[in-house]
């Protein structure tokens, strides 16, 4: 389960907290507003002696889920999965609730390992107005992953990554259906095979990605594409 879970909660400020070894999403917020976290340390990959945790495969670090006005700053996250995953529910349940994640600010943070700051892939309520600014990514496989697979529905929009730097010398993860590169937008996330020319009807399960801005980004990486669209 989650190590910290906030649900239907507003006006929370957390500071100088260290959380480790969550078997699932580490710090998860759902249906919350006005959450601020300052100088938070999250580690779902290594213990305090540098030994790797075993058996953690979906250990997202920080996860606002159908939340608004969430602020994460001056924090360190080391993850075996997404360091940050902005979500808004999944499939029929997420579309029924229809609460987007919006007005998310992630600034002056340091991310180590994992897959950087992700939008989706659970995004049935929509994700919009997210800023990731002045962050460093060390041995992370990506800065930005925008995952909107067909079938999830809703829209990921007004997402900005600005003044971020990635240096990755870790070659343990190869390009796959789960990972494409340092900056990637993927409407076929998780699919083993797909035909981009195949017709699929447009409806409530059709996912949309639009208005994504990448500005002043530096990349040095050994695995995956630099940019994948």
What is each PLM-predicted segment?
Residues 1-229:
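Extracellular/periplasmic carbohydrate-active domains that bind, remodel
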